[in-house]
């Protein structure tokens, strides 16, 4: 797919702020950012309250999505330009939503809010409202979504890409460093997964790297282009960014996202993989009464214990 089919530049965006049938939509991790200022004429989607089911941990359904877009003044035939902060990670999340429910004309503003601000382009604090429409969402296209059983069946069969940070992947931490409250239930990663942090696909200004750079990034990490791919993180915003890169920019057709099905969602019969140091640290944190016969650092330093037989990682299960 050509980049112009899924991306617009900041120059194009500024020239088309008032174009008919073009709607700019801001979706941010920081849901208050839009309220401070935004691209003139852009409307807001709140990823927490607008895109999440209020009762269960799932997406809004087609009826809810139709109601949402109708109330915000978006029509089926509109071209929707999505943007946000932090390299467009939640904008990519919303992009995936629009594709899930069959919206044909949707693109990302390359570089998002970061590039727009770096360029010194104008922002507005004026409230925005649009006339109500009668939007009709299509039934969900679940071919771009992977469910739990599909993830379990994919272990050592398909490409599994863990797009979180290396420290989350190894089990050292349970959440993004700047969001310590957003913890997974289990440390580590799904066995067989490769780690390609989502943010490596972006340049310093938030724009996407070239196709050549992106292809090399995933090839160097061990992505097998002949296999289907499932990307995962924790909530889905980071894996949506990777899904956009692989499918919309690089043209990989069999790419799915597993929302909420990282290592923390695997049943007791599945495993998370983590390094030994992290394992013992997590073990003693969970069970304070547990005492090791010898400090693990001492075992490691003396060359004894598990490291002495070449074991540097463990497959572990955690109680749910």
From Swiss-Prot:
Pfam families linked: Rhodanese
Gene: cysA2
Enzyme Commission no: 2.8.1.1
Superkingdom of the source species: Bacteria
InterPro entries registered for this protein in UniProt: Cyt_P450_CS, Cyt_P450_sf, Rhodanese-like_dom, Rhodanese-like_dom_sf, Thiosulfate_sulfurtransferase
Official protein name in the record: Putative thiosulfate sulfurtransferase 2
Lineage: Bacteria, Bacillati, Actinomycetota, Actinomycetes, Mycobacteriales
Residues the record lists as binding substrate: 238
Role noted for this protein: May be a sulfotransferase involved in the formation of thiosulfate.
Keywords: Repeat, Transferase
GO molecular function: heme binding; iron ion binding; monooxygenase activity; oxidoreductase activity, acting on paired donors, with incorporation or reduction of molecular oxygen; thiosulfate-cyanide sulfurtransferase activity
Originating organism: Mycobacterium bovis (strain ATCC BAA-935 / AF2122/97)
Recorded catalytic activity of this chain's protein: thiosulfate + hydrogen cyanide = thiocyanate + sulfite + 2 H(+)
Catalytic residues, chain numbering: 233
Domain spans labelled Rhodanese: 18-125, 154-267
SUPFAM superfamilies: Cytochrome P450, Rhodanese/Cell cycle control phosphatase
This protein's domain notes: Contains two rhodanese domains with different primary structures but with near identical secondary structure conformations suggesting a common evolutionary origin. Only the C-terminal rhodanese domain contains the catalytic cysteine residue.
CDD domains per the UniProt record, alphabetical: TST_Repeat_1, TST_Repeat_2
